[in-house]
Amino acid sequence: MLCFADLPSEIHHRIIFHLDSNRDVAALSSQCKALHSLCDMSNRKKYSRVRITPSISDLDRAFKMLMDILRRRSLGRYVRHIEYRQTISRYCQYDVKPYEPKLSEEDMRLLRNATQRAGFTRALQERVLNMLVRELVVGDRLYGTFSDTRAPATYVTQALTALLVSLSPNLESMAMMPTFYTNFDEDTADSFMHSECPLDLLLRETNENPVDKPYLQNLRRVYMINLGDDHSDDGRLYVAMDFIGCLAILRNLPSLEWIGTDALAEDDNVLPALGPKSSNVSCIAIHHSAVATSYLTPVIRSCRALKEFEYSIGGRGSVNGTQPTFNPKTFFLCVLEHKTTLERLDLDVESHIFSTVYRGPGDFEFDEEDGRAEAQAYWIESPPNSFWDQRGCLKDFEALKSLSIGVHFLLYFATGVNNENDDKIVPLVEYLPPNLEYLCIRGYEKGKRKRNDAQMDALKALLDSDSTSLKEIHGVDECIPNAEDIDFPDNYPDLLWKLPDEWSDEEE
């Protein structure tokens, strides 16, 4: 009988090429010496991940990887994750400086060809080349990083990242800071300054014209690193970042599924607008953040088919001690547009909902702040009347399998909006989504409200009856607390959320 190891090497190559995980390839390589050689595990591990920061050691490592790939293009297929960490604190035109020709003529030819393949031509090509070799200029360095002038660091890190992205056809995930400069201080309609930043230009061009590009075709996940303007995040407060602007320059990438961030506060930028159903993104995760419903609305509505949405507050203090408005009705209408596709919804926001003391559906009056009237009067682009006139309730979410939510918000979802149940209390067990398998309820305390106790007892009885798709319920027998802002962050450092800074060459 023919075994796998006896198959022709061409078939082995094809199988290995389609394995996403290095761990799977490593397991395959252990089967025999021939497969071990084909799997090339040492190079797979070495080139699978790269981090680009203003640190000279990181830049040297990334530049060496770039040259290795240019000399042996097959190495670029191993790159699966790229992290870019550099802020753009202000716009400054790139200052071309002469460089010492330490690279060979052949290496310079390879660099020149690579910049051209990445779409940089004519004068811009020469500037990008200058950025790539500028790291050899001693005068730019200070204490192991680039000098306080942010422009050189920004351009060098962006040029390196852009070239590595363009040479990595199997790139699946990125973690990066915003690639563009936004002037938060000037009240102008043109919030985006002209950009010469190579990574920003590469992303924008590919987003606008993704067809026939040999790069960014397999990128599925992007995490936006939120360290603030000029790395201003001190770890205590929510941080303003133009998340909408970041989504706008990524949304058309053909394989992009997931985008997320943490510690997000609203920025002052109002451009560009996100039109409805304009994004390929289907999964959004915004955690430890504080933004209003007016901010989340265009993000959610931009998805052509939303499958997963996660939003949580807490872990930081607010900038001025106030909370952004979270309007449950407006939010419900946003996700109701995706009732046939939404599979997972995770919300930990009840502490930001005004009038959260729930006595009955009629106690919720959410037509004012971030509601229909205010949106139509003050939002830059208010949803149409058809959005506000939607009718629906929790059981209309036919694709929903996993739901994590505060107890009061859950009961509000069950009642729904613009339907015959307005001002009524409905039995939760009769309004669950038909395919729900997992339910996590936050903030429920047994004995605090008899009406809620009866609803939770009915849920437990339903689970025991085996007549439901529901397989797990959490937060009924034990209280799962709602997330909250940290009112005095200096007094509670252990409660503050921090961005993990772990890095290794091991695949996640």
Describe these PLM feature segments.
Residues P298-I313, Q323:
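Acidic, serine/threonine- and glycine-rich low-complexity intrinsically disordered segments
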Residues G119-G139, N226-D234, I313-P324, D348-E381:
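Acidic/polar low-complexity surface segments
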Residues P54, Y84-I88, M176-Y181, Y223-D230, ...:
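Concave beta-strand-loop units of leucine-rich repeat
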Residues I15, I69, S89, L336-E508:
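Leucine-rich solenoid repeat modules
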